[in-house]
Amino acid sequence: MARTKQTARKSTGGKAPRKQLASKAARKSAPSTGGVKKPHRYKPGTVALREIRRFQKSTELLIRKLPFQRLVREIAQDFKTDLRFQSSAIGALQEAVEAYLVGLFEDTNLCAIHAKRVTIQKKDIQLARRLRGERS
């Protein structure tokens, strides 16, 4: 069916306003709950996408320095006691660890997408590590 062009028409008074039902009128006239405004919430996934863009732009380390340092010292205790670390050595370890984790999560995401999912799961990480040859 062909579309027709609509033209503006002059109003001739129109209809009288309809009467509201009793329940609607009661709902509108009821006092509000103190005017408390609900906090704004973004749709699910919006904040996650914003964080992804923010972290992909940034170059700073994402793991906090002191907790990482404590973890390194704790693991090193198992091999030899009274080990000392230069701050640059801890920094180099942290750079390497974060680069490894970012790469692993990229591969994990590809595994999830291959399975037609958007959420990564434990089995995706296991598959990514298996394909890399890290885990038999």
Swiss-Prot record:
PTM-bearing positions, type N6-acetyllysine: K10, K15, K19, K24, K28, K37, K57, K65
InterPro entries named in the record: Histone-fold, Histone_H2A/H2B/H3, Histone_H3/CENP-A
Modified residues (Phosphoserine): S11
PTM per Swiss-Prot/TrEMBL: Phosphorylated to form H3S10ph. H3S10ph promotes subsequent H3K14ac formation and is required for transcriptional activation through TBP recruitment to the promoters.
Pfam families: Histone (PF00125)
Subcellular location: Nucleus; Chromosome
Modified residues (N6-methyllysine): K5, K10, K19, K24, K28, K37, K80
Record Gene3D superfamilies: Histone, subunit A (1.10.20.10)
N6,N6-dimethyllysine, modified sites: K5, K15, K28, K37, K80
Region listing for Disordered, in residue ranges: 1-43
Modified sites of kind N6,N6,N6-trimethyllysine: K5, K28, K37, K80
A GO CC term assigned to this protein in UniProt: nucleus
Keywords from the UniProt entry: Acetylation, Chromosome, DNA-binding, Methylation, Nucleosome core, Nucleus, Phosphoprotein
SMART domains xrefs: H3 (SM00428)
GO molecular function, one term: DNA binding
Record's function text: Core component of nucleosome. Nucleosomes wrap and compact DNA into chromatin, limiting DNA accessibility to the cellular machineries which require DNA as a template. Histones thereby play a central role in transcription regulation, DNA repair, DNA replication and chromosomal stability. DNA accessibility is regulated via a complex set of post-translational modifications of histones, also called histone code, and nucleosome remodeling.
Subunit structure and binding partners: The nucleosome is a histone octamer containing two molecules each of H2A, H2B, H3 and H4 assembled in one H3-H4 heterotetramer and two H2A-H2B heterodimers. The octamer wraps approximately 147 bp of DNA.
Family: Belongs to the histone H3 family.
Protein name: Histone H3.1/H3.2
Species in which this protein is naturally found: Lodderomyces elongisporus (strain ATCC 11503 / CBS 2605 / JCM 1781 / NBRC 1676 / NRRL YB-4239) (Yeast)
Gene of this entry: HHT1
